[in-house]
Amino acid sequence: MELFVGTDIVEVERIKKAFDANSKFLERLFTQKEIEYFNSKRMKLPHIAGFFSAKESISKVLGTGISGFSWKDIEICHDEKGAPAVILKGKAKNIADKKGIRDIKLSISHTKTYAISCAIAIGGEKNDSADLKTDERS
């Protein structure tokens, strides 16, 4: 068994600059469900920065950085209690399966100026994916 940990912190201003400079910023990095969540929060930049940070943290858990798969292969959502949750798709899911990762726990926090996240997973054994939350459409 192996413990995988990833953390990330991002300045909200950095996300604002990227958002202002590229009209396709959201569509390039986030799934439709994530964008719908941002719309429900009136596109508040700290929420967007938090999801960005979470995707970075998860890429560190997977050990590849974002270069190993698409940004949209990681989807941030919320469980029935409102806690952040992770859905892996495509290449990100394949990497998690190879590492035997069954579940990823995620924490996200933000202020007006920073967003931070921490992702933790246990793996190391071959996994049948039964416990990992996935999107079967991918």
Curated annotation (Swiss-Prot):
Recorded catalytic reaction(s): these are: apo-[ACP] + CoA = holo-[ACP] + adenosine 3',5'-bisphosphate + H(+)
Under Enzyme Commission nomenclature, its number is 2.7.8.7
For the biological process aspect of GO, one term held by this record is: fatty acid biosynthetic process
Q: Which InterPro entries match?
A: 4-PPantetheinyl_Trfase_dom, 4-PPantetheinyl_Trfase_dom_sf, ACPS, Ppantetheine-prot_Trfase_dom
Positions of Mg(2+) binding:
8, 56
Q: Which domain of life is it from?
A: Bacteria
Q: Is the Aminoacyl-tRNA synthetase keyword given for this protein?
A: no
Q: Which cofactor does it need?
A: Mg(2+)
Keyword Lipid biosynthesis attached: yes
User: Where does it live in the cell?
Assistant: Cytoplasm
| UniProtKB keywords | Cytoplasm, Fatty acid biosynthesis, Fatty acid metabolism, Lipid biosynthesis, Lipid metabolism, Magnesium, Metal-binding, Transferase
GO annotation, cellular component aspect: cytoplasm
Q: Which GO terms describe its molecular function?
A: holo-[acyl-carrier-protein] synthase activity; magnesium ion binding
UniProt-listed NCBIfam families: acpS, pantethn_trn
Q: What does this protein do?
A: Transfers the 4'-phosphopantetheine moiety from coenzyme A to a Ser of acyl-carrier-protein.
Which family does the record assign? Belongs to the P-Pant transferase superfamily. AcpS family.
Q: What is the official name of this protein in its record?
A: Holo-[acyl-carrier-protein] synthase
Name the species this protein comes from: Thermoanaerobacter pseudethanolicus (strain ATCC 33223 / 39E) (Clostridium thermohydrosulfuricum)
